[in-house]
């Protein structure tokens, strides 16, 4: 989930900063605000209703369907790894389909926070004197954002990623409860 949030959130925040107060910025801010402000348990319930009950695109609650639950021996107690060890490819696909929605929702929460903060840090960098000098030298706005401002904002962005990881551990408890997933939330 943190990988999804970082791989999508940082470029989304950079695009929002590059096109500040224009359509891509407004759309990106709406997506990041939705991911950051909506409760994770509500997103989980809506995701289950839409993508599992109505569309049937993902697996439902639990780690596996009942048909596969007892066919896979528990070696590591991590279903994806246990199904690979057992060579049960259908069970692997089933376990992966059960993992997609919870991981995506946690990734959406991480994406929202990382994108908002990346945009904020980059807008601050774009107001600095060195970006004015780069503009006067004729460098394009995208080159300034992606080559210079993003590099200078990397320190605060890495700090936010670490804080997001801690925030996701908190959200994992609710996500695991909604999706009946016995994970790290049982131990916290």
Residue spans of the language-model regions?
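Membrane-water interface segments at the C-terminal ends of transmembrane alpha-helices
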Residues: 31-64, 70-82, 105-111
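Alpha-helical transmembrane segments of integral membrane proteins
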Residues: 1-24, 40, 71-187
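Membrane-interface helix-entry/capping residues at the boundaries of transmembrane alpha-helices
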Residues: 25-29
